[in-house]
Amino acid sequence: MATTPYAETAGTRPRVRRDVLFTETPDGVIFHNADGGFQLTAKSGYRFATLLVPHLDGARTVEEICQGFGDRQRAMVGELVKALYARGFARPVPAPDETAGSLVTAPPAAARFAEQIAYVDHYADDADARFARFRDTRVAVLGHGPVARWCVLSLIRNGCATVAVDPALPAGTGGVTAEEFATVHQEAADLAEQGCPVELAVLPAPGGASGPEGWAAYTGYDVVVAAGGPDVPSTVLPLLREGVPEGRMLLPAWTFGQRAVVGPVMTADSTGCWSCAALRLGASGGAADAAAADLWSGLALGTGSSGAQPAGPLAAMLGNLLGYEVFRLVTGALPAETRGQVLIQDMASFDVASERLLPHPRCPFCAAPARSPEPVDLSAAPARPAFLPTVATAPDDDAAQGPLAELERRSALVRPHTGVFTRYADEPVTQTPLKVGSVVLGAGPRGPRTVTAFDVHHTAGARLRALNAAATVYAEHVVPAARAAGTLDALPAVAPDTLTLASGTGGTGTNSGWTLATSLVTKEEVRVPAGAVRPFGTDNADRRFEPTRAGAGAGADLPEASAAGLLSALAHDALRRAVRGEGEVAVIAPESFGEDPETVFLLRSAAHLGVRVELLDLGEHAYSGASVVLARTTGTADGSGTGGSSLAPGSWAVGAALDRTAAAVDAVRDLLGAAQLASEAPESTGGGLDTGDPLMRDLDAALIPVTRSGPAAPAAPAASGASGEAVDWTGILERLAAAGRDALVVPTHAADLPTAGIHTVRVLLTRAVTDAG
C-alpha cells in the first residue's frame, strides 16, 4: 500500500531554513530562496502558509502540529513538508537532547549571541550545543601584529570566552600599539557587563629560559592560531615536527611573497600540512621561486620572512577570517575553508583563491609510507586508453562526453598555486590539423616544464595524454623513491645487467639500493635496483642504467598504467635492437593500412604540413607479439631536405600498441604534432618542445638501417603471435615467459595523483636467456 506524504513526515520535526520566503500569487503561494523555488497551487494557499510556517521551527513533529486537523488539512501539511524537504527548503531535526551533561549556552550568552546561534541553526542541528562548544573553546592567538589583534576581536565578538595572546600584543611592543589593543579590553569589559565574561590571558614569552617549549607552552588550549607575522614559519614548523596532539588544532596565517595564505588547519590525523602548502606554492614557478627562497632561507637562518606583512584593511580581513574559521571548525555549521585547503589572497589586488591542498610527496610529515605493491592483472587493461573514442563513435556528439568527464576529474590536480600541475598552456596554440594539449608542472630544482601531447580527435584527449605524460615526469623528478619499511634481503634479486635498461658500463660496481617490484608474469615479488626504477635520479648517478622514460606508464588504474609502461619498455627494446642492426626492420607501405580513417587523415596532414614521413616496422611482433612502429622524416613532401616543414630530416617518433595500425597512428601523430608546432613556432623544435623525458637521447633516426629488402607484411587487425592468432596482454606476457623474460612493475606515484584517477608505474623488462650476457 502506498504511503501518503503525511504518513512519511508525521514523525519528523520540520525546520524551515531562514533564507526561505513565501509570496502570494494569483493561484496560491510560491516558496523561494536565492537558489530557486516552487509553487503550491491552492486558492487559500497563502493563508495556509501564513498560519503553518511559523510552526515549522523544529520544536514539534508534524503529527503534533496537525492535532485537531481534518484529513484534508493533514494531507496538505504532509505534501507541503515533503516538498520543502525535497527541495532543501527545510530539514528534519532531531528531538532536543535533554540528557544530563549536554552542552547548554548560558541564558545571558544565548541572548547576547542570538545571531550567532541562529546562524548555526540555519545550517545544522543542535545549534545551542554547537555554540556552547565554541564558547567553551580555549584559543591561543600567536603573533603581535594587526592580524592577531583583529583575530582576537573576531573571536570575542562571536562568543569565544577564553583567548590567550602573545605578551607583546597588549604591551604594544609589536606591530600594534597599546592604545589599539585597548579596544580589545573594552570589548571584553562590555561583554562582562552583559553577563558574558571573557578571559583574556597572556601566554608565556616565547624563547623564555625556563618556560615550556612546543605544544607544552599551550597546554589547555584547544586551538592555536598563528596569526600572521614574519615568524609564522619558525613557529609552525617546530609544532608540526612535534606532532599536533589529539583533539587540538593548529591554524596558520602566513605570507608567501606578495600573497597572504590562510591554512591549512592541522590536526592529529589530517593530511596536507603547512609544509605541503609551502612546497606546493614554491613549485609553481615565476615569482614563487624567489618567495620560496625567502621563506626557507628565513626559516633556516632564523631571520623570518623578509616580505611585506598585511596591514590596514587587509589585516582586518585576515584576522576576521581566522576568527570565523575557528567558529566554523568548532561548530561544524559549515565546512571549514581551511580543512584540506588553503586560502590565498593577493596583498595588492585583494583577489582571493581557495585551492585544494594535497599531501606533497616530499613532505616528511604527510608522505605516506611505502606499501607492498599489489599484483597487477594486466588482462584488465584496455587495448587502447579508455578515454579515447573509437573511429566508429567519433562522429557521435556524445563520444566526447567520456573524455570530457575524465578530464574534469583529472583537472582537480591543475591549480595555479597549490596544484600538482599549475595550468594548461594550450590556449594560444592552433588546434589543427591535430589537437594539442599542454600542461605546466613544477619538476623540482630544474624549474617548471610544459609537457605537450597530441590527439587526432579532440582537445580533451590531447590534454588527457598530456596529463599522463606530465604525471610520469612528476613521478620521476618530484616523487622520492619509495623505500620499503623492512629489509628486502629475503626476496630474490634481479641482477642489474639482466635488465634491458642496463647501459653496459657496469657503473661503479655498487648498488645504491633496492626497490620492491612485482612480476606481471608470475605475480611474485622481487627486488630490483632502485636506479633502474628512477633512471634520472641520484640512484642512477653512475649511469649504470640508461636515462630514459622507457617503462614509465600512466593510466586510470594500475592495469592501464602497467600496460602503457609495458608498451613503452617494448618500444625502447625494439628501438635498441634496430639501432644495433639486429632483428628485422622493414618499411611500411602507406597503402597497407587500407582505408583506416586515422592513418589516411594523418598521412594527408603530413603532406599539407610539408613533411615526408617514412614508417618502419621495428619487428617487435616477432619477439613479444606487440607492434612497434617508428615514424621518421626523410625531407619535405616535395622531396627536398628543407622547405615548408621546420622539422629536420631524421626527426622521429615511435608508437607501440597491440596492433600495427594503432602503433603507426601513435607514431605519426606525435611526429606531425611536433611538425605542426614547429610551423607555428620554430623554436619549439630543437629542445623547446617537451613531450616528457626522452625515450632515447640523441638518436639520429636516419641512421637506423632497413634490414628487410621488401616492404613489411600487410597490417593484420591485431598483432599476431607465432600461431597467427590475435595478441592481447595475456599473449604478450606468455611470449615473454616463453623467451625466459619477465616484466616487473613498480608503482611510482605518491598519494596525490590517484585522488584524481592517475596512477603511474615503471615496468622493467629482463633480457632473453639467449642475450642475457
Provide a role label for each language-model segment.
Residues 1-431, 459, 499:
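Adenine nucleotide-associated cytosolic modules
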Residues 112-114, 230, 334-773:
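Helix-biased "structured C-terminal domain" signature
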